[in-house]
UniProtKB/Swiss-Prot annotation:
Residues at the catalytic site: 425 (nucleophile), 478 (proton donor)
A Gene Ontology biological process term: glycogen biosynthetic process
Protein name: 1,4-alpha-glucan branching enzyme GlgB
Cellular component aspect of the GO annotation: cytosol
Species in which this protein is naturally found: Cupriavidus necator (strain ATCC 17699 / DSM 428 / KCTC 22496 / NCIMB 10442 / H16 / Stanier 337) (Ralstonia eutropha)
The entry's keywords: Carbohydrate metabolism, Glycogen biosynthesis, Glycogen metabolism, Glycosyltransferase, Transferase
Reactions accelerated catalytically: Transfers a segment of a (1->4)-alpha-D-glucan chain to a primary hydroxy group in a similar glucan chain
Pathway(s) the chain acts in: Glycan biosynthesis; glycogen biosynthesis
Top-level taxonomy: Bacteria, Pseudomonadati, Pseudomonadota, Betaproteobacteria, Burkholderiales
EC number: 2.4.1.18
């Protein structure tokens, strides 16, 4: 179409029309909206698809009919009063060619939206409320309700909001660039269709003017459910204030707690496959609140750890390839439902940990990859920016805005959703520039080394900021190497995490468990080596999702032997783990002794609870958690060597292990743990203990209630003043086959007819 003939007010050169209607104008505010025109005001609007446009006052009284300057949909009118800036004092009444109509304030009549302090903090990577600054923010500007859109794309030639309220037309709502920050912004009034629930994306031209794939909002607070890829405008109460929280007591207690001395037993959950009924885009989180929370409460776990719930396009990634780091997945319901789930957990006395992925992101075209036509979030050089193992892109942590995007994203979950901690995924891949790379495939740091200095700085800053702003929130590293000081303080040169997954312990002990009992004598050190370094870091002992997939077998499937030996061996192993120094983590299904590996497309095999052996395993996990929480000796000194002492660590011939756990260096709160990893019962097995007197058998994994043979010590044993194993007293035990015993010293206990 061509410009209208004549000399209508507001006529533009032909190239301006072409730029506006072709969605290629780099500065739409220079020509659209109100502009001084002598003693009046000239108003232009670009509204492709409009049949007519009228200017009215705020009350709807007509002021002027806008003339069509171009057949493509550019209009202009002159108001007989001077424009002085500030709030728009007119409205656009649009009659669309399909017969519908709208009347609202002109998006191009509003002044600058983001303050200079906001822009400065974004550029410094220190805007910790980024989720309330960028993205789509429902708010009131100059007395008018609407949505403020803002996105970082410094190298784009043009950015437009495209949405269901503007026909996904890039010429309808081009944005304003704020130099030199690279932030594009636009306020679209609600009367023009921008509302909570609106679906939107960004349409960008790269630095050369080439159109890019439509992009989802990196700061979206809500999204469509995959496979759809649009972002969604989130309204008030959707996870951020003013959501009505009921967990003030929980948050206050959390802030004053000592996580190292407290019991911590984590139930790791993939929310989409724990129960298939929860795969409900409206009620998923509500269903989990109704079913998962009381289930975890009954089993006695202190925390739920959720595999990544940030929105991710590929369900088969289990959430570990996320794109919307500020939005909970829409597969389970809206953001406010996720907040309500966490609120319910806290009211039930259960903490919530979230797996969080700052190491890499997928290459989906609607995501962060070459967001503005350049390597914006990632490194340009694939030797730094491409992860060969996962076919993903690596965040450029040397860039302030990228670092700030991730830091604010972490705080978003902790502050606005009240999450109790973050388990940071794939830390080892972040720390080493040559991680999973051959010579020539990586770029050394500025000193010529393999350490990723930018990642080290980022992780230290992450932990410092989280601990400063979120009292009691935990950070946990999945770090699979021997990097020193992962849980040492930042001030002492460490990374500053609260805990680290003990991957070495997990690999060694599962390797031992997989051997036939007759061969375990030659692998005894697999069970004992973890105590050599147990206090070098603050550890979590993880039996995670990664250990029950990809041909590794389920937990019960790892154990050799007939069915009885498998169940007994796994019960003994769980007892060994719960009594071992370190916090605990068990992936869902482990409590059921599922035969099949985890399948993210199916739910847990709940029917197994109808079978006595599986029900027995379930009961054992409940009782292990109860005992672990009730006995300070099993958790109070997890992080200090004073809480542990070997009694027998070298009986490889019998595959027996025994140790003491203490609640304090001089405490008489003492527990004896004995593990027999062969199917042979041992009678009269003498062990040294620090005190003569009654020792109560608190737990026997061979008890009949768990599916065992009920071999044991009749509930108690009397220790006598016969030195053994460097201790002043000793007792003689019956060791059940493939079982763990936990005995507690009872200073006031008396035993009739007990064995000695």
């Amino acid at each position: 179409m061509t410009p209208a003939h004549g000399t209508q007010p507001g006529m533009l050169p032909g190239h301006e029309f072409e730029a506006l209607l072709g969605a290629r104008h780099h500065d739409p505010f220079a020509v659209l909206g109100p502009h001084p025109d002598g003693d009046g005001t000239l108003v232009r609007a670009c509204l492709p698809g409009a049949a007519s446009v009228q200017l009215t006052d705020a009350g709807g009284t007509p002021l002027a009919e806008m003339a069509r300057l171009h057949g493509g949909g550019v209009f202009a009118a002159r108001l007989p009063r001077e424009y002085k800036g500030g709030a728009p004092d007119y409205r656009l009444r649009v009659q669309w060619s399909d017969g519908s109509g709208q009347c609202g304030a002109d998006p191009y009549a509003f002044g600058l939206l983001l303050g200079e302090l906001d822009l400065h903090l974004i550029a410094e990577g220190r805007h910790f409320e980024l989720g309330a600054c960028l993205g789509a923010q429902w708010q009131r500007v100059d007395g008018i309700d609407g949505v403020r859109f803002a996105v970082w794309a410094p190298n784009a030639r043009r950015v437009s909001v495209i949405a269901d309220f503007n026909g996904w037309h890039p010429a309808r709502h081009p944005m304003r660039l704020r130099h030199p920050s690279g932030i594009w912004e636009l306020f679209i009034p609600a009367a023009l269709g921008a509302q909570p629930g609106s679906r939107y994306k960004y349409d960008l031209l790269d630095p050369h003017g080439t159109e890019l794939p439509d992009k989802a909002d990196p700061l979206a607070l809500a999204t469509e459910a995959p496979p759809a890829t649009a972002s969604v405008v989130a309204g008030p109460g959707q996870g951020a204030p003013p959501f009505a929280w009921h967990d003030a007591d929980w948050m206050a207690r959390r802030g004053g707690a000592d996580p190292y001395a407290a019991p911590m037993s984590v139930y790791e959950v993939h929310a989409l496959s724990w129960l298939r009924a929860a795969n409900d885009t409206q009620r998923g989180w509500e269903i989990l609140a109704e079913r998962l929370v009381p289930y975890v409460q009954e089993l006695g776990f202190t925390h739920i750890e959720l595999l990544p719930i940030t929105e991710h396009p590929f369900g088969g990634s289990w959430g570990y390839q996320p794109l919307s780091l500020y939005a909970p997945t829409a597969r389970l319901g809206p953001p406010q439902a996720f907040a309500a789930f966490i609120d319910r957990c806290h009211q039930a006395g259960i903490g919530v940990l979230l797996d969080w992925v700052p190491a890499h992101f997928p290459t989906d075209p609607h995501g962060l990859a070459r967001f503005d036509g350049t390597a914006l979030y990632e490194h340009e050089d694939p030797r730094e920016g491409f992860h060969q193992d996962w076919n993903t892109l690596i965040y450029n942590l040397g860039r302030n805005e990228v670092r700030g995007f991730l830091l604010a994203g972490a705080l978003h979950w902790l502050e606005h959703f009240h999450a109790d901690g973050l388990r940071v995924d794939a830390v080892a891949s972040m720390l080493y520039r040559d991680y999973s790379r051959e010579p020539g495939q990586w770029v050394p740091n500025r000193f010529g080394g393999r350490e990723n200095l930018e990642a080290i700085d980022f992780l230290r800053e992450l932990n410092a900021v989280v601990h400063e702003r979120c009292p009691g929130a935990l950070t946990i590293a999945e770090e699979s190497t021997a990097w020193p000081g992962v849980t040492a303080s930042v001030a002492s040169g460490g990374l500053g995490f609260d805990f680290k997954w003990n991957m070495g312990w997990m690999h060694d002990t599962l390797h031992y468990l997989g051997h036939e009992p007759v061969h375990r004598a030659w692998h005894h050190q697999d069970m004992t080596f973890g105590l050599v370094y147990a206090w070098s870091e603050a550890f979590v002992l993880p039996l995670s999702h990664d250990e029950v997939v990809h041909g590794k077998a389920s937990m019960i499937g790892k154990v050799p032997g007939d069915e009885w030996q498998r169940f007994a061996g796994l019960r003994a192993y769980y007892g060994f783990m719960w009594a071992h120094p370190g916090k605990k983590l068990l992936f869902m299904g482990g409590e059921l002794a599922q035969w099949q590996e985890w399948n993210h497309d199916a739910e847990l095999d709940w029917a197994l609870l109808d079978h006595p052996m599986h029900r027995g395993m379930h009961t054992l996990v409940r009782d292990l958690n109860r005992l672990y929480r009730e006995l300070p000796a099993l958790h109070a000194l997890d992080h200090r060597p004073e809480g542990f002492q070997w009694v027998v660590g070298d009986d490889n011939h019998n595959s027996v292990f025994a140790w003491l756990r203490r609640a304090g260096p001089y405490s008489r709160e003492v527990v004896l743990v004995v593990v027999n990893m062969t199917p042979v019962p041992r009678y009269g097995y003498r062990l040294g203990v620090p005190y003569a007197g009654a020792w109560q058998e608190c737990l026997n994994t061979d008890a009949a209630v768990y599916g065992g043979t009920n071999v044991g010590n009749s509930g108690a044993v009397a220790a006598v003043d016969v030195p053994s194993h460097g201790q002043p007293a000793s007792l003689a035990l019956t060791l059940p086959p493939l079982a763990t015993l936990v005995l507690r010293f009872d200073p006031g206990g008396g035993i009739q007819g007990a064995s000695t």
